[in-house]
Amino acid sequence: MVAVARGTLRRTPLYEEHRALGARLVDFAGWEMPVQYAGIKAEHEAVRTRAGLFDVSHMGEVAFRGPDAERALQRLLTRDVSRLGEGQAGYAAVCLESGGTVDDVIAYRRGEGFLVVVNAANREKDLAHFRRHTADLDVEISDETEEWALLALQGPEAERLLQPFVAGDLSALGRYRFLETHVDGGEAIVARTGYTGEDGFEVFLRPAEAPSLWRRLVEAGAAPAGLGARDTLRLEAGMCLYGNELDEETTPLEAGISFAVHLHKEEEFVGQRALQRQRERGLRKKLVGFELEGRGIARHGYPVAVGGERAGVVTSGTMSPTLGRAIGLAYVPPETEGGFEVLIRERPVPARIVPLPFYRRKRNDPEGGASG
């Protein structure tokens, strides 16, 4: 799958498609990836109103096989994967014994085994962590990143555009469910998952088959979209980004993803005791959404002041293309209510805490349809 470019940068199977479309390519986690094509705002709007197509082949895929595959993931992930049925996926965190977050992932149950999608920048770290904590189990852990290309088709028209290429009824596919089927004639996995806050699908297929499907979806009306729009979309949807909202010094409870933490499953997971203590004793910090009430845009790393004292940090911020307001995520002391100030070039700008997500789509998909 992977070719080498500009020193050590890797390229996805769609690199030539990106060049042909005039994409601006950047180094992202060691991959030469498209950050934008027509422009971030236009691509963002296309996903919210029609459908956008992303190349996310840089994401890592790790397969778990063998008699202890499920037990291994019960030990490694915060989610109770024993509850996942065939064709079902689940979002989870991977933790250190301290409770800090190694990564956030999605696990797909495939028969007796699993496919786990990890963040590109964390792939090697994750593999080492997985193997270190399961050395006593009968499980085969394989890096299959180079065996898959991954396309994400997101937006209200995603189902209509993808259905002609899929052997299977997408309208019956619920949120976090997937089909092992044929797409455009080749073997593929089609999942109703995403990272945008819209309905949509992620399609795993063999690298050699990815360019053809990409071109046919673009011809059908999907707008090519880059990592820039992917970031503004996920921020409006209140979704965490590893390296911003999540890191090894931050627990899943602090990051507000406790829905993916199952503290009472039979197999104790790495970091479970630390998270149980934190739940009993209280958080050190909490993640909140905010809107600026003054001029400016909050950016990653800007300080936060509560009661005139520096007490937190902005993790993500942008001018929301959908809402037309400056929004962001920040860590603040757990007792913080109402609002705070963001220091933009040392100038305090009032910010109001608001509920997450900033944007919630109107649902008209089948029961349990994707939130993106």
Curated annotation (Swiss-Prot):
The keyword Electron transport does not apply. GO terms for molecular function: aminomethyltransferase activity; transaminase activity. One of its GO terms (cellular component) is cytosol. The keyword Metal-binding does not apply. It is an enzyme of class 2 (transferase). It catalyses: N(6)-[(R)-S(8)-aminomethyldihydrolipoyl]-L-lysyl-[protein] + (6S)-5,6,7,8-tetrahydrofolate = N(6)-[(R)-dihydrolipoyl]-L-lysyl-[protein] + (6R)-5,10-methylene-5,6,7,8-tetrahydrofolate + NH4(+). GO terms for biological process: glycine decarboxylation via glycine cleavage system. Its EC number is 2.1.2.10. Pfam families: GCV_T, GCV_T_C. Keywords: Aminotransferase, Transferase. The glycine cleavage system is composed of four proteins: P, T, L and H. The glycine cleavage system catalyzes the degradation of glycine. PANTHER family: AMINOMETHYLTRANSFERASE, AMINOMETHYLTRANSFERASE, MITOCHONDRIAL. Belongs to the GcvT family. This is Aminomethyltransferase.
